[in-house]
Amino acid sequence: MAEEKIVRVWCDGCYDMVHFGHANQLRQAKQMGNKLIVGVHTDEEITKHKGPPVFNEQERYRMVRGIKWVDEVVEGAPYSTTVKTLDQYNCDFCVHGNDITLTADGIDTYAEVKKAGRYKECERTAGVSTTDLVGRMLLLTRSHHNLNDELDLVSRERTESLSTDSDSHSPWTRVSRFLPSTQTIMQFAEGRPPAPNDIIVYVCGSFDLFHIGHLSFLEEARKLGDYLIIGIYSDNIVNEYKGNNYPIMSLHERVLSVLSFKPASEVVIGAPYSITQELIDRFRINIVVQGNRVQHHPTIDDIDPYEVPKQLGIYKPVDSKNDETTEGIVDRIINHRRVFEKRNAKKEKKEIAAYKALQKLKEEKCSHGSSGTNEVICIEDPK
C-alpha cells in the first residue's frame, strides 16, 4: 500500500505585531494539509511595500515560530509569492485570507500562484488587524502620555480615523468590534485536560499586545512542568493597575492571542489578581511562576498577590530572558507617530482601491455566470 502523500501548505506575510487574526489564518491553513511552512518578509521588503514594521524581522521570525500550528519558518521570504518559492520548499499550494495584499506598484502579490492554480483562500478574522492595533495605540497619546505638544484638532481627527469604523475605510483593516464566541475559543484551545501525574504550572498577567517578552516568559514557565495554565486578567483589573486606556486589547482578544502559542495548555478567563487557595485547589496547581522582569503591583489593600503560593512553598520566580513590555511597544508607536499615521493611511487607501476592483471583478464574473477566487488585481498606487 502506497504511503499517504504529505501535503505541505505555504503561507507568507509580514506577521507584524502578531495577533490572533494571523494565528487564525495559520490555523485554517494547517487544516488544509499536513505541514505548514510560513514565510516571513524582511524589514527591507516590508518598508518598501507597506512602510516600516513595528517589530523587527528577528522578533517576527521568533513570534511566528511560537505559533502552535506552524511547523517551519522561512526567513526572508519574497514579498510576492511565486511558483518557484512553492517548489523550492516543496509546497503544494499557498493559502491566504480573503483580503488583498498588494506590492508598492499596486499588483496582487499572489497573481502568479493564482494563475498556476496553486492558491487557496481562508476566512479573514473580522475585527482585528495590525493597522487597527496601531490606531488604538496612537489614540493613547491623548491621555496616556500627556505630551506637551497635545494633538491639535486636525491631528486628533486624523489619528482617530485610523481606529474608527467608517464606510470610507478598507473593509479589511478598519475597526469592527471583535465578537468572541465559544466556538472560536474551542478552535484555539488545546482541548487536552492534564494527565493525573502532570506537573501543573500556573502563571498570570494581562498579556496585552502579546509580544516576544510574553512568549519568552511562557516558554520558560512551561519548562518547569507538563501543563501550563495561564490566568488572564479582566479588562477592569488591568485598567485598575495600569490606568488610562489600558488594556489595548479586550479580554477575549487577549485570551485568543495567548492560546495561539505553543506553551499554552489552558487559560483562566478573567483570573483573580491575587492567587488564592481556591484557585490552586481547583486547578491542582503544583508551581506558581512569576517573571522577574516586570513589576507586579500589590493589591488595593497592599497585599502581595503571590502571598498564598509563597506560603505554600510552590512559588518560583523565573527570568524570561527578554525585557520587552507592552508599554515598550506603545512607546515605539508613539515615538514614531507621524510615520505610522502615514503608513496606516496609505495602506487603507490602497486596500480601498483593491476592494473596489475586486468587487467589480466579482460582479462581472456573476454577470457571465462564473465564479472563483483566483482573480488577479492590479491597481494604480494611491498617493
Whereabouts are the PLM-identified features?
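Nucleotidyltransferase catalytic core that binds NTPs
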Residues: 1-383
